[in-house]
């Protein structure tokens, strides 16, 4: 039951999905959506619904509805029916129909007597109101999609048309859906109108029903039609403003027919001979490639305007009808027109079957259709697909067998002992001079580059073309391409039948075939012969006089119409302003650049021949509405922009409305509220932040206001002229009238007040004031020089050291510090500047708000206030003195009085004490003495207490004598009692203790009493001051708590880093101990996966491999599995067990998989290969998926110092910088020379090619664990020796006997070689500069080398620790590719910028020091200094041509080195002249090295763009403004110093050096290089050829001259000779495929790939198993194969990646962080079958 329910549920779901995805439902949905695309056409329908009433009103409603529906039906039909769509979509038809109709409709509704027929009946035909309502709704529904931009919902219909098979059903259903939506909309409108009529509150409005407004309401109802027409007109004008009509567009001047021939790659396939005229496909654009033939003189050129057709008179047929950007193609000098999709579907034959090609040339398909319509006999009969496929497969099988036989024959010839040079297939080259053996350049060689070749020839100027020139050259000008497209014919027989043809015009290059030539096909029918006669009679010439045959030409006159072609070679308005356009370019700009004006700021008049001008482009501050669009283009498809301000700087679409600052009513930002609440808790710096924010907002508002004022002056007519004259008049009035009058008035007043006049000081300040004329944007010129075109462009007047009238000048000698400070302040005010306004005011910036002048009367009022203050304070000082003296006298009197009272009381007490008798007890004299002493003490203490009590109550004793007597009596009693108590206590003590003890205890009691009294005093003082102490403690505690809280994150992070550091160090130390224990018991195992990082003095620098350099990618390709050698400890201890027969096969297989040893006795069983997906492997490395922002956080500013301070091995002899530089230069020179000579070694090339093949092996994973790695084992010895030989390594003879490789034998320093030339050969000696990969070395483990004692740091690789001077290199994948080490180390700090910088610019740093040849200075780059730069910036074709020139000039250098250098410079200049376009004649002048370098870079490296640093740009402009003034001054010191003090001129960007190279500008951060996407059509065939043809072996590489051999022997050291003499198994690298040429090799590979019958493969990803077909072959296991190892190595199977270009492009995405948007398919691997040995 559950199964049945689920089955029913599944059926229901599938049924629902089918219904939803059906054509009818989707059509209804899209039709319903188009209802909401409400446009101006709805205005007529609503007006008919609202306004018209009665019987006529109902008819109008019906007619409006029917017209509306009919118009929408026509729109839907036009989607399906192409002619109707073209008729409605033509811009001239819409313009002709729409604009007059709109005009007629506007006048009809606004003019009362326009169509007034008087009283007519309803049935008369003259009443056109109902018909007009129908037409209005019909026509405006058609206009809505074409003349007015429609909604996006209406365009969704066209999207679904590509997916839908039954298009008519979709159109019908969408119309029905629209009809349903329209009916619902109309019903809703009717309900709204009924609700308005029935609502009494609206109808019973007092204002509407009042008598005052009845007339207005009636007028409003009568003129409703006029209001609707006005609304319609406004909407139409608004829409047409964004999409101008073609009738008002800009007409471009027609370019002459003598322009360069341009076109696409299909049109460039021309012969190598010069073609002075274009071919029949004269137009470069594919769409307009109709037949056009050359005519001597055309009658249309002399036609009057009324004789021309109406369409060409009104409309510009050369108009660019889309808002296209103009992109110039450097190679063919034509525009890139991409109006269509890059995919064009058409049927073609592929693999012998009719298939749909998605990149078919659209012009070819349209031409086929035209020919088939015009000539019925041209249609071919369709043959069965099986017949075609079998015939095609037989031909390809035959070709494959022939190639296989040829390859086997060549291999057999190699076995017989033939030389390799004779066996290898040579590339066929075209030569144009057999005696000198000069070949064509490779870019023009048809045997190398196929269809991508082409030579562009310029026609002579139009004035030179005459009739004689045409008649002389007309014979060889017609290169007909149609015969190659239509049918295959035998051209020799065809030339015999048509004898009057010129043989040169129809001759085709004969292809070379290694086997039999293709069979000649005959013309089977007479119809085909008629076709070719029809096509070729047009250019049939007479053999005698070579004149055109007029008879056939007149018959073919209809086809010679002028083809509408686009005008190209347009220049922008900016280029016109800069004045750098070319000679043959029209002066009128055709591109709308950003609105700007060219302002000349300096002219050099010293040279009489030519005037150099320095100019700046002043751009308008408004939004750039032009956006580099071609003039005359219609902008209907531009993004919709809305303007709501008078001057809007940043216009944007309403889509981005949420990004602008909105009002509080329209936005509720919760995050902002949270921030405000949290900010309120922070009480510190709250006010300061508010003030800063207010100031920033105020500055933004002020800047916006200034821009608006500047734009208003610049936009209105004659505004700049009026402003300029006003400024000059204000300047003259200020300088010569107002200020002198003020000086006279001031000094005359001083004289009247009997003060010394200050004529000299005032006149000195007045003369110092300068009125400098500036450009409109503030560039200073001089006092007398006006800027060019200042009346139209505008002017500013800057006042330097403005004069301010002062009431007096202070004296020079002011000693006090306060006076000095005032003086510096006054000096700063003097050095200030200001700009003059129209009203004579002063502003800090142009068009800024007026600033306050220092007031003349303010210092006077200050001085008066001071003096009045002094006068007021004099009488009060006398009174104060008297008061102070009176208070002192009173105090003295009080003190005397108190002293007298104290003395009188003391005398009285003494008298009483003396009058009392002394009681002497019956004891010894000693005891009496002691008792007397105690009594005295007690009396003194009592006396003190008594005195205190007397002091406290002295006032009471004065008042009453009775109280005094009582107190005295009480005191006496207390004393006597106290004395008695003391005596009793003492007696008791004496009875128990001795006399000495008694004396000691009494002293203790007395000290205790004293301490207690002191404590009492201190306690009272502490209580009094405790309040302040508590406050102080609270403050200190709060400060300490705050500091502790702020230090918590720092402490925790520090503890965390220290803990992680210690943990990692312990972990590393333990691992190292384990590995050392294992390595003591085992031998060296050469395997790449066990590479250990170099550790200097127990230091581990964790260089992160996240940089993903090129070397790392290759390293990961070669590393497949990691073996765990700890499990094989017992096996690895003995080498005997490896070759033993008693070891298990599993262990042998494991060792064989890892490539540890040669296992020769085991049978070779080959594995089944699987497709390893490159992209999935890259995706698995998730750590490389970081965004660029995360990488940017790791960048440090001092990475350069780290790189320069790094060193590999410290050599104590290299102490001086000079000796190091010299040695470095010698080593680099030797390495470069040795590398250049290694190029000529064929063995080196074979080894290099085999390294690439090794990585191809490694890129495949094995399905079985049994994997033959004999290739990697055999590579070991040769690769090690080649690496040591190449890099000049000493002591290599001992490497075989050493367990580890010592770094000290290496003499190359990776980190200190900043110039990359020794590692990447940029001196044009190599063809592949960036992709050069040298032979690598398989190293197992490197020992620790003892360097200087350094601390162990975890973050050392980031360059954060400056104290590290010699960090070691731990990434040993660079041992295989040392060229890429510097790239990778810098790539880790700046992973998206540094590789581009280093690859392009670092070779500029290498400058030859030991130059012994003296040369004359030329205007071009010196050959030795910047030769590498020149060759790098040239493209590869020119570089190869320069290689040949350089190799040929080597012989001349020995004979005459100076002449050889000059010749070499000439050839370089010739190459540069060909690559660079010709400038105007007045611009041909000598340039500096930096200018030429920049030009070369910008022309050749079109994939990158240079831009200024944004902060640096403003600094340069400020400096330029000051420079322009300083140049014109005789003594500029004062103004220069003042401008530096004001901050106008920054010293950090001054040009101290004369010649700044581009690399230095990059390092300083002045120029920034960025990748940019350009729509330049790259030479795809050339890229494929160079990528796949890596192993190209040329003939000249096998020849080594004698002098090269001698130099090689000299350069080889004794250690290198040991490595060279070692046995090298070069045959192991050899691939049988390399015998064939690259072209034949590709053909052989493709033919093998076509045979897909017996191939078995599976994808590693299981989800693709069902979809992917068989792609690879499995090696056939044959029993008759020889098991001898040498033969197996010779006929080893070879893996070839079928799509290596995709592999490299995918890797390139990770090297340089560049993507081109293509989706790369997986790598498909093909394996050759093994050849049997006879």
From Swiss-Prot:
InterPro entries: TIC214. GO terms for cellular component: chloroplast inner membrane. Keywords: Chloroplast, Coiled coil, Membrane, Plastid, Plastid inner membrane, Protein transport, Transmembrane, Transmembrane helix, Transport. The chain crosses the membrane at residues 19-39, 68-88, 91-111, 133-153, 176-196, 227-247. It comes from the Eukaryota. Residues 1433-1485 form a coiled coil. One of its GO terms (biological process) is protein transport. Its main location: plastid. It is a multi-pass membrane protein. Belongs to the TIC214 family. There is a partial copy of the N-terminus (positions 1-302) of ycf1 in the inverted repeat (BAF50510). Part of the Tic complex. This is Protein TIC 214. It comes from Lepidium virginicum (Virginia pepperweed).
């Amino acid at each position: 039951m559950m199964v049945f329910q689920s089955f029913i549920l599944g059926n229901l779901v599938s049924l629902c999905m089918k219904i939803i995805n059906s054509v009818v439902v989707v059509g209804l949905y899209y039709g319903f959506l188009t209802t909401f695309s409400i446009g101006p056409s709805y205005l007529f329908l609503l007006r008919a619904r609202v306004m018209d009433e009665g019987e006529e009103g109902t008819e109008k409603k019906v007619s409006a509805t029917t017209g509306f529906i009919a118009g929408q039906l026509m729109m839907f039909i036009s989607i399906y029916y192409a002619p109707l769509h073209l008729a409605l979509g033509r811009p001239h038809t819409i313009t002709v129909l729409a604009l007059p109709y709109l005009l007629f409709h506007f006048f009809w509704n606004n003019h009362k007597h326009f169509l007034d027929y008087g009283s007519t009946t309803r049935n008369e035909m003259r009443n056109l109101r109902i018909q007009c309502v129908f037409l209005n709704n019909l026509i405006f529904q058609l206009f809505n999609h074409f003349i007015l931009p429609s909604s996006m919902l209406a365009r969704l219909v066209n999207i679904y048309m590509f997916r839908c098979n039954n298009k008519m059903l979709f159109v019908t259903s969408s119309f029905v859906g629209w009809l349903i939506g329209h009916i619902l909309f109309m019903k809703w409108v009717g309900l709204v109108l009924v609700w308005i009529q029935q609502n009494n509150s609206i109808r019973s409005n007092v204002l509407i029903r009042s008598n005052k407004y009845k007339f207005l309401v009636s007028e409003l109802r009568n003129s409703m039609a006029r209001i609707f027409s006005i609304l319609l007109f406004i909407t139409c004008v608004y829409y047409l403003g964004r999409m101008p009509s073609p009738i008002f567009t800009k007409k471009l001047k027609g370019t002459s027919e003598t322009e360069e021939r341009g076109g696409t790659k299909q049109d460039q396939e021309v012969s190598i001979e010069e073609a002075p005229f274009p071919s029949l496909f004269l137009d470069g654009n594919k769409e307009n490639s109709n037949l056009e033939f050359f005519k001597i003189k055309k009658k249309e050129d002399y036609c009057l305007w009324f004789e021309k057709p109406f369409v060409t008179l009104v409309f510009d047929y050369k108009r660019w009808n889309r808002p296209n950007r103009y992109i110039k193609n450097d190679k063919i000098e034509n525009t890139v027109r991409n109006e269509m999709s890059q995919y064009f579907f058409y049927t073609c034959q592929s693999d012998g079957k009719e298939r749909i090609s998605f990149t078919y040339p659209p012009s070819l398909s349209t031409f086929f259709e035209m020919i088939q319509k015009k000539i019925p006999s041209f249609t071919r009969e369709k043959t069965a697909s099986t017949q075609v496929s079998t015939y095609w497969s037989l031909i390809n099988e035959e070709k494959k067998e022939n190639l296989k036989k040829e390859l086997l024959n060549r291999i057999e010839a190699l076995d017989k002992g033939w030389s390799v040079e004779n066996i290898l297939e040579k590339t066929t080259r075209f030569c144009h001079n057999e005696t000198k053996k000069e070949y064509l350049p490779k870019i023009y060689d048809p045997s190398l580059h196929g269809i991508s070749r082409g030579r562009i020839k310029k026609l002579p100027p139009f004035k030179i073309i005459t009739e004689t020139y045409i008649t002389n050259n007309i014979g060889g000008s017609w290169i007909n391409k149609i015969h190659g497209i239509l049918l295959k014919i035998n051209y020799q027989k065809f030339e015999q039948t048509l004898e009057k043809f010129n043989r040169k015009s129809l001759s085709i290059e004969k292809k070379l075939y290694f086997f039999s030539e293709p069979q000649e096909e005959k013309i089977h029918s007479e119809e085909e012969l008629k076709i070719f006669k029809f096509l070729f009679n047009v250019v049939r010439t007479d053999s005698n006089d070579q004149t055109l045959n007029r008879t056939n030409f007149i018959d073919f006159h209809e086809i010679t119409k002028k083809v509408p072609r686009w005008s190209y070679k347009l220049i922008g308005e900016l280029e016109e302003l800069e004045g750098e356009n070319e000679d043959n370019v029209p002066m009128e700009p055709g591109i709308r650049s950003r609105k700007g004006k060219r302002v000349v700021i300096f002219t050099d008049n010293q040279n009489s021949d030519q005037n150099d001008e320095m100019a700046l482009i002043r751009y308008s501050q408004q939004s750039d509405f032009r956006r580099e669009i071609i003039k005359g283009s219609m902008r209907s498809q531009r993004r919709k922009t809305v303007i709501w301000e008078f001057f809007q700087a940043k216009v944007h679409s309403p889509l981005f409305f949420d990004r602008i600052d909105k009002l509080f009513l329209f936005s509720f930002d919760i995050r902002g509220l949270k921030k405000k609440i949290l900010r309120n808790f922070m009480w510190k710096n709250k006010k300061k932040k508010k003030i800063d924010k207010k100031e920033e907002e105020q500055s933004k508002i002020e800047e916006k206001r200034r821009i608006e004022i500047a734009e208003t002056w610049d936009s209105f007519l004659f505004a700049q002229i009026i402003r300029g004259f006003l400024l000059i008049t204000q300047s003259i009035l200020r300088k010569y009238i107002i200020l002198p009058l003020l000086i006279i008035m001031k000094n005359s007043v001083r004289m009247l007040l009997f003060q010394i006049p200050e004529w000299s000081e005032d006149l000195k300040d007045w003369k110092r004031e300068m009125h400098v004329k500036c450009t409109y944007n503030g560039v200073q010129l001089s006092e007398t020089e006006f800027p060019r075109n200042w009346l139209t462009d505008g002017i500013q007047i800057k006042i330097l050291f403005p004069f301010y009238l002062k009431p007096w000048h202070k004296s020079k000698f002011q000693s006090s510090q306060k006076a000095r400070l005032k003086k510096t302040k006054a000096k700063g005010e003097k050095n200030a500047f200001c700009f003059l306004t129209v009203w004579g005011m002063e502003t800090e910036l142009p068009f800024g708000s007026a600033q306050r002048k220092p007031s003349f009367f303010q210092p006077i009022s200050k001085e008066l206030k001071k003096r009045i203050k002094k006068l007021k304070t004099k009488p009060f000082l006398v009174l104060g003195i008297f008061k102070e003296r009176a208070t002192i006298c009173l105090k003295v009197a009080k003190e005397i009085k108190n002293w007298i009272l104290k003395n009188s009381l003391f005398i009285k007490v003494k008298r009483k004490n003396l009058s009392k008798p002394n009681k002497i007890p019956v004891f010894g004299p000693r005891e009496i003495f002691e008792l007397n002493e105690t009594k005295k003490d007690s009396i003194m203490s009592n006396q003190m207490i008594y005195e205190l009590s007397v002091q406290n109550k002295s006032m009471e004793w004065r008042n009453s004598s009775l109280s005094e007597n009582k107190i005295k009596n009480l005191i006496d009693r207390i004393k006597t009692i106290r004395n008695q108590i003391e005596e009793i206590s003492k007696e008791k003590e004496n009875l128990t203790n001795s006399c000495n003890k008694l004396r000691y205890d009494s002293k203790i009691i007395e000290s205790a009493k004293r301490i207690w009294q002191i404590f009492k005093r201190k306690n009272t003082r502490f209580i009094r001051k405790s309040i302040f102490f508590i406050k102080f403690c609270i403050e200190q505690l709060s400060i300490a708590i705050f500091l502790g809280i702020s230090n918590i994150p720092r402490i925790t992070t520090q503890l965390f880093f220290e803990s992680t550091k210690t943990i990692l160090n312990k972990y590393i130390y333990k691992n190292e101990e384990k590995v050392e224990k294992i390595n003591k018991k085992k031998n060296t195992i050469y395997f790449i996966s066990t590479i250990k990082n170099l550790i200097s003095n127990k230091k581990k620098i964790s260089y992160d491999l996240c940089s993903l350099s090129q070397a790392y990618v290759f390293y990961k390709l070669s590393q497949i599995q990691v073996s765990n050698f700890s499990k094989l400890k017992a096996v690895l201890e003995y080498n005997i067990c490896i070759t033993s027969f008693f070891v298990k096969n599993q262990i042998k297989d494991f060792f064989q998989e890892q490539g540890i040893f040669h296992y020769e006795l085991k049978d070779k069983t080959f594995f089944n290969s699987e497709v390893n997906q490159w992209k999935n492997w890259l995706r698995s490395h998730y750590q490389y998926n970081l965004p660029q922002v995360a990488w940017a956080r790791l960048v440090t500013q001092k990475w350069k110092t780290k790189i320069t301070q790094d060193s590999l091995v410290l050599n104590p002899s290299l102490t001086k910088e000079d000796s190091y530089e010299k040695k470095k230069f010698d080593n680099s020179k030797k390495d470069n020379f040795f590398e250049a000579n290694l190029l000529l070694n064929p063995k080196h090339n074979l080894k290099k090619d085999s390294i690439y093949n090794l990585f191809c092996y490694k890129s495949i994973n094995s399905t079985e664990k049994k994997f033959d790695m004999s290739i990697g084992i055999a590579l070991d010895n040769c690769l090690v020796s080649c690496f040591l030989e190449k890099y000049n390594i000493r002591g290599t003879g001992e490497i075989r006997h050493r367990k580890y490789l010592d770094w000290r034998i290496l003499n190359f320093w990776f980190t200190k070689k900043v110039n990359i030339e020794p590692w990447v050969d940029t001196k044009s000696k190599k063809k592949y500069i960036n992709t050069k990969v040298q032979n690598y070395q398989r190293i197992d483990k490197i020992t620790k080398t003892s360097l200087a004692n350094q601390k162990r740091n975890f973050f050392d690789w980031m360059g954060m620790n400056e104290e590290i001077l010699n960090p070691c290199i731990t990434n040993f994948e660079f041992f295989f590719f040392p060229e890429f080490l510097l790239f990778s180390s810098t790539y880790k700090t700046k992973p998206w910028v540094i590789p581009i910088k280093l690859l392009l610019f670092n070779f500029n740093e290498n400058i030859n020091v030991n130059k012994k040849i003296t040369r004359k200075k030329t205007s071009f780059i010196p050959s030795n200094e910047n030769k590498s730069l020149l060759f790098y910036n040239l493209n590869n074709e020119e570089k190869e041509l320069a290689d040949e020139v350089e190799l040929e000039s080597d012989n001349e250098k020995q004979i005459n080195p100076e002449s050889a250098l000059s010749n070499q410079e000439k050839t370089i200049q010739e190459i540069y002249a060909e690559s660079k376009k010709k400038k105007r004649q007045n611009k041909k002048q000598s340039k500096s090295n930096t200018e030429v370098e920049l030009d070369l870079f910008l022309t050749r490296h079109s994939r990158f763009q240079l831009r200024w640093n944004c902060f640096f740009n403003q600094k340069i402009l400020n400096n330029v403004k000051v420079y322009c003034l300083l140049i014109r001054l005789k003594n500029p010191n004062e103004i220069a110093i003042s401008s530096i003090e004001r901050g106008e001129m920054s010293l950090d960007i001054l040009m101290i050096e004369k010649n700044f190279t581009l690399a230095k500008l990059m390092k300083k951060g002045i120029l920034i290089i960025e990748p940019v996407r350009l729509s330049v059509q790259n030479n795809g065939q050339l890229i494929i050829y160079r990528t796949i043809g890596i192993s190209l072996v040329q003939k000249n590489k096998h020849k080594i001259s004698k002098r090269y051999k001698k130099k090689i022997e000299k350069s080889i050291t004794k250690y290198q000779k040991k490595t060279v003499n070692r046995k090298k198994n070069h045959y192991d690298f050899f691939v049988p495929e390399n015998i064939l040429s690259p072209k034949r090799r590709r053909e052989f590979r493709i033919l093998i790939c076509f045979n897909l019958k017996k191939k078995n493969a599976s994808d590693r990803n299981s989800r693709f198993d069902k979809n992917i077909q068989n792609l690879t072959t499995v090696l056939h296991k044959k029993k008759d194969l020889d098991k001898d190892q040498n033969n197996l190595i010779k006929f080893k199977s070879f893996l070839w990646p079928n799509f290596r270009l995709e592999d490299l492009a995918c890797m390139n995405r990770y090297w340089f962080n560049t993507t081109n948007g293509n989706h790369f398919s997986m790598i498909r691997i093909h394996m050759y079958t093994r050849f049997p040995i006879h």
